[in-house]
Amino acid sequence: EYVGTIVEKGESVATLDVGDFVIGSFMLSDGTCEICEAGYPSRCANAGTYTGSQAQYMRVELADGSLVKVPGGQPDDPDKLADYLAASDVLGTGWYAAVAANAGPGKTIAVVGDGAVGLCAVLAAKTLGADKVIIFSRHGDRAALAREFGADIVIAERGEDGAAKVKELTNGYGAHGVCEAVGTQESMDQALASVRPGGYVG
């Protein structure tokens, strides 16, 4: 994941210019294949992962589909660069989870995981209009940040007890959608146990 300023561009680059401040992830995408057009650029049929962003300069293939131009250019304050860096991975991943969980008005969304991706999923679910956001968290500082980002309820319980708590808060049904933001079998089990029949797990 990286941010940077374009210092040179190839002839095939059509949407970016020298001097543009851009955000990139560790994935390349052409932005034109059927998978990209469906909204899944990290699974591009014609690209994949790459490395090299720790270097001072790097060449980014498929730049039009892989880089996002930041309006307004590079911030004057160097300390703000880290804010943009979050958009290269954790914010997009959390946003994707909330979209895949079908977050929106009238929905209750649960978030499994209180790390950076989970916290961004809370922020995304609220931004997408979810009525209620529940997060599983046992860490006081992260729970406080989750509330600041829009979480309405924090659940410390895990496993069957955690799923029972979600169901108790949703008239016995379970959440309309669950954002799984850990990546373990246990966290996926928690997500599946907490979602209602016909619900979504992102």
Locate predicted features.
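Glycine-centered, small-residue-biased loops immediately flanking beta-strands
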Residues: K107, G199-Y200
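NAD(P)H dinucleotide-binding glycine-rich loop of Rossmann-like/cofactor-binding domains
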Residues: D30-V112
